[in-house]
Amino acid sequence: MAVPVLETERLILRPLSIDDLQDVFKWTGDPRVNKYMIYPLYKSVEDGREWLESVNKDDDKKDFGFVYKETGELIGSGGIYYHPDREVWSIGYNISYDYWNKGLVTEAMKKITSWAIENFDVKVIAGTFAVGNTGSQRVMEKLGLTFYEDTEYSKLDNSETFKAKTFSKIVKK
């Protein structure tokens, strides 16, 4: 199933495309946003090309761009990703620094997870965040996820490893 266009009070959630390359760099190239992200800091707009070209090609990954209705600007992205080996759907998200602490990620992810639950056989939703990333922890708590385990993860280029926590929620047994 293709990623649809969804709407919340303040956001339009839509598929990402290569046309978003310049806007995506606003957060992927910002060290404040990138601090705990799995991908390395993008040093140029072109660093995001490979990711954007791949986002809509994997049926198990549902990525959305977050468009702020008030300005029409693409301000972040997030999604839900199926892991068939574990029958778990994981969530991930990021947003431009200027939009932190406004409840926008929670608003977007509530809509995205509700859409996934309505359209797929979602049994468990999980998310992992670095210890110290209190903003991400708050989003997961507001989504109803609770502590599952201590873990760790590394950036894709192995430049940094983080102590982390995984939160989860059983949707149905």
Residues of each region from the PLM?
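Conserved GNAT-fold acetyl-CoA-binding loop/helix
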Residues: 32-53
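A short helix-loop-beta-strand connector motif used in the catalytic cores of GNAT acetyltransferases and
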Residues: 53-65
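Juxtamembrane/interface motifs at transmembrane-helix termini
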Residues: 43-46, 55-57, 69, 96-97
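Acyl-donor (CoA/ACP) binding surface of acyl/acetyltransferases
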Residues: 1-32, 63, 67-173
